[in-house]
Amino acid sequence: MFASTLITLAACGAIQATTLHVSTHVPQTAQAITRDAGLNSATLEIGGLLSWGNGKVYDVARTPTSISQVIVRVAWQPQFYRGRPLPMWMRGKVALVVEGVKAWIDQDPSASGLGLNVLFRYTWTTNRWQPMFLGGAGILYTDEQVPPGETTRNFTPQVGLGLQYLVQDELAIGGEYRFHHLSNKGATETNPGINTHLILFGVSWDR
């Protein structure tokens, strides 16, 4: 009787030890997955950029020009995966980016205007140095015809690459290169577009 009681107590102790081991192990795994998945947590980004670039009007004379811009940016970065993290080289954020643009165009007569860009961007977020690529299009309204003799409304498709550095967890500085095209998409018979190589520098905050 005494021996059977000892065997029963030993079995209960083994089951309890196994239960404790499992209960301490599972939360650690869950924490690791949650921590990795947090690399792509949903955020709202607010930022500002300054840009300048040399361009060329694709008229007969190939007239040189330049474009300067002040940009205010809002980007929504949703979370697209849960649970098991992605491979390291794939970890990043997809963002829908909306930009308000104030632009100045060097021509005769000089022109300025307001515009709106809608872009899609992918940013790799594996460390504090974060490369990105982006592309989209916008529309720009100006106070003078751009180029001269054309229209005051133009479309602005653009693609680019960038690199940002996280100064703090929610604060980043960075730069971009964009190939920027401006034209009226056939609203006039001639429609000479402007191709510009833009360099941008700015700062952003994640919320």
Language-model features: where?
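Short loop/turn motifs that connect adjacent beta-strands in outer-membrane beta-barrel proteins
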Residues: 26-42, 79-94, 125-130, 167-171
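Surface-exposed strand-loop-strand hairpins of Gram-negative outer-membrane beta-barrel proteins
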Residues: 51-71
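Transmembrane beta-barrel strands of outer-membrane/channel proteins
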Residues: 42-56, 96-102, 133-139, 175-179
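Outer-membrane beta-barrel "beta-signal"
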Residues: 70-78, 194-207
